[in-house]
């Protein structure tokens, strides 16, 4: 807003760093470890502001938070804007407005490069030779540039992104030779993915039929062969609608899920907001208003399961599983609220989130995803996180340096995500559009236990 409205200021920093001290505690086994202390961690009974001192853009150990990544992007002084609101109708070229916010430096001091990417593949690159002037009075220097793009034949599921990067031509005088310096002073990403491209319906006519469908009184066991020749098996609880024990070649991949999930671990700003305790689902259970409706295709290649989920809140939710004989499962979920979920209104609580949760078996540590990354990001803080293909591990997703354990590890704009073991076997989840996802070794309910204030971070400093 501070760039689009003349009467709005913004982008100011409240605190640069979390104001905390490394503090020693004695563990139950008599050993000692350290954590980042705050509030009343040293002298009980004295007035304190709890963890209010922990709102910096750097952690207490001076490493950057994901907020610092966003801050750097928001403060950059070269910015790019689309001339046309709809950038998906390119017709072979696009126009971009370039704005120079430097007070004394023209853009001739920088190298400006662009790259067109299809998914994670770069299909064309180029440079912009600009001499956009610096500010004059209170007016920024700006000009409009045209980028010629190759003709492409996009298909449903393809993602096209244009990335623009600005780097210094000459190393700055203030930068000594012993400092790490990535040379990037500004960047932007534009989504050029055409809209309206629909995926073709899954054609299961060429699939082999299920090898086995055992329909018991309360559990249906389904087995078959994947497209790669692996043997899969899963169990469906007809009473609860929960899928469990999904195995590939005898190894359990998915222990349980998906189940509705409405609980998000509170962050520090959420403390005044009331969450309905009924939303907690520590055991990942699910209840139905009526028995599951199950229909097996006469060709033995497709099973549809329809569920009317019983919820602890004033809302309705239906779920559908389309289970195919190659091991793929298409999950559809519809949530219809009957309440405003307005905290502060008599008898109403906030609804932290609407989603699904799955419990993956141990050993599936390798994480790969296509979406905003690589740092944790949220819907109100993701413009600095470029859409791309990222690899990590589940252990690396938990952000342990927050003074008070809170919601963390989220990624937005997810097209697909996967978890695999050392052998490369695993589980992949993809979306028709985009979703948010996280992969953690702890549940949201574990981060904010109901019995204590959980004063210590779950992972000590050493």
Predicted segments — roles?
Residues 101-106, 170, 339-341:
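Short, acidic/polar linear motifs in exposed loop/turn regions
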């Amino acid at each position: 807003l501070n760039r689009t409205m003349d009467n709005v200021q913004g982008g100011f920093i409240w605190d640069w760093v979390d104001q905390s001290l490394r503090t020693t505690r004695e563990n139950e086994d008599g050993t000692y470890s350290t954590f980042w202390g705050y509030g009343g961690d040293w002298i009980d009974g004295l007035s304190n502001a709890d963890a209010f001192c922990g709102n910096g853009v750097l952690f207490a150990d001076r490493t950057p938070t994901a907020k610092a990544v966003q801050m750097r992007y928001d403060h950059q002084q070269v910015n790019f804007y689309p001339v046309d609101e709809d950038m998906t109708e390119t017709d072979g070229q696009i126009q971009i407005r370039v704005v120079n916010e430097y007070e004394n430096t023209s853009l001739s001091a920088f190298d400006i490069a662009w790259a067109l990417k299809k998914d994670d593949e770069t299909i064309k690159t180029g440079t912009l030779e600009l001499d956009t002037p610096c500010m004059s009075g209170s007016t920024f220097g700006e000009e409009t540039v045209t980028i010629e793009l190759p003709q492409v034949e996009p298909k449903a599921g393809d993602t096209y992104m244009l990335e623009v990067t600005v780097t210094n031509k000459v190393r700055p005088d203030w930068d000594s030779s012993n400092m790490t310096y990535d040379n990037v002073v500004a960047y932007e990403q534009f989504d050029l993915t055409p809209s309206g491209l629909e995926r073709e319906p899954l054609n299961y006519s060429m699939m082999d039929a299920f090898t086995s469908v055992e329909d018991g009184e309360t559990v249906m066991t389904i087995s078959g062969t994947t497209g790669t020749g692996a043997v899969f098996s899963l169990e469906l609880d007809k009473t609860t609608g929960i899928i469990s024990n999904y195995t590939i070649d005898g190894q359990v991949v998915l222990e349980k899920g998906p189940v509705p999930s409405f609980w998000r671990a509170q962050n520090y700003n959420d403390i005044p907001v009331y969450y309905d305790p009924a939303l907690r689902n520590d055991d990942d259970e699910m209840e139905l208003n009526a028995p599951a409706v199950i229909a097996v295709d006469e060709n033995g290649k497709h099973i549809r399961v329809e569920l009317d989920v019983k919820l602890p809140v004033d809302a309705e939710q239906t779920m559908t599983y389309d289970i195919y004989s190659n091991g793929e499962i298409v999950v559809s979920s519809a949530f219809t609220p009957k309440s405003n979920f307005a905290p502060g209104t008599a008898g109403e609580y906030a609804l932290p989130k609407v989603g699904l949760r799955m419990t993956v078996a141990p050993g599936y540590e390798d994480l790969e995803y296509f979406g905003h990354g690589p740092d944790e990001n949220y819907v109100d803080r993701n413009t600095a996180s470029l859409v791309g293909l990222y690899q990590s591990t589940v252990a690396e997703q938990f952000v342990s340096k927050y003074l008070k354990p809170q919601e963390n590890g989220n990624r937005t704009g997810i097209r697909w995500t996967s978890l695999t073991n050392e052998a490369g076997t695993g589980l992949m989840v993809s979306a028709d559009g985009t979703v948010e996802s996280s992969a953690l070794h702890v549940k949201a309910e574990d981060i904010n236990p109901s019995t204590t204030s959980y004063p210590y971070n779950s992972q000590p400093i050493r």
